[in-house]
Curated annotation (Swiss-Prot):
InterPro entries: Nudix_hydrolase, NUDIX_hydrolase-like_dom_sf, NUDIX_hydrolase_CS, NUDIX_hydrolase_dom, RppH. It comes from Cronobacter sakazakii (strain ATCC BAA-894). Transmembrane segments: none annotated. Gene3D superfamilies: Nucleoside Triphosphate Pyrophosphohydrolase. Its cofactor is a divalent metal cation. A motif (Nudix box) lies at residues 38-59. Residues 6-149 form the Nudix hydrolase domain. The gene is rppH. This is RNA pyrophosphohydrolase. Keywords: Hydrolase.
Length: 177
């Protein structure tokens, strides 16, 4: 489902832990990392799509998380011309996204990237809140900056109330399955 401007409706998901770190996932078989995201199906609300994508991409269910915030507006990014599929109709030139900030209420062990026969990710780790803004692929950076700026007021109090960590370096976890 592509809108009249050529953008595909999509949801983005930022999952934070009780220390205010965010889940950073490695795309399957690649060296690129990002937040979980995915398209909204016809007849599906953004929230319904978010829960579906949450399970498909990281194996978490509604009971495992709580919604802390959503972006006020849809945020858009354009795909680089080399990634646009010009032979499909209608042509999709980018994504328009509604973002959700979730707090993980269950254990790290409940994260399972093997719920699909074609997994999106093959590993993940907890990183500092602002880390993804500098590390995501360049054409998504502006959207990530805007998302994190909007969610910062919700996550920063979590970081301030969190006990100090024994291991400050991010732990890298392989897929479960």
């Amino acid at each position: 489902m592509i809108d009249d401007d050529g953008y595909r409706p999509n949801v983005g998901i930022v999952i934070c832990n009780r220390q205010g770190q965010v889940m950073w996932a490695r795309r399957f078989g690649q060296h690129s990392w990002q937040f979980p995201q995915g398209g909204i199906n016809p007849g599906e609300s953004a929230e319904q799509a978010m829960y579906r994508e949450l399970f498909e991409e990281v194996g978490l269910q509604r009971k495992d998380v709580r919604i802390l915030a959503t972006t006020r507006n849809w945020l858009r990014y354009k795909l680089p011309k080399r990634l646009v599929r010009w032979d499909t109709k209608p042509v999709c030139i980018g994504q328009k996204q509604k973002w959700f900030l979730l707090q993980l209420m269950s254990n790290d062990a409940d994260i399972n990237m093997q719920t699909s026969s074609t997994p999106e990710f093959d590993g993940w780790r907890w990183v500092s809140f602002w880390y993804p803004v500098r590390q995501v692929v360049s054409f998504k950076r502006d959207v990530y900056r805007r998302v994190m700026k909007e969610f910062a007021s919700v996550v920063m109090p979590l970081q301030e109330s969190a006990p100090p960590q024994r291991n400050p370096s991010p732990a890298w976890r392989r897929k479960r399955g």
